[in-house]
């Protein structure tokens, strides 16, 4: 279970699959997601005004993890909760606001729209 940190109307979601690159047979998956990975989720809790369908699978980008992230300078950063942002087919966020801090590693993975909507980049 992870929190959804935008105003799309979804409050919590459960990860179903982690997308990690491609192979000759198609997409291959991994069991753990890190910051900047695209995951497929099932919506578990949402507001009544949410326009996303609870019965379908949706895409998210992980923006915070409890697992420490090692940076090239040797420092580690970790967050208090696992959080993601709902995205559409083009990789743009569905919501117009992002709550809480996001990791700087999203900038390296070209999620500039998420970086610009976030209040703080750690």
Please identify what each model-predicted range represents:
Residues 1-122:
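Ribosome-associated RNA-binding proteins
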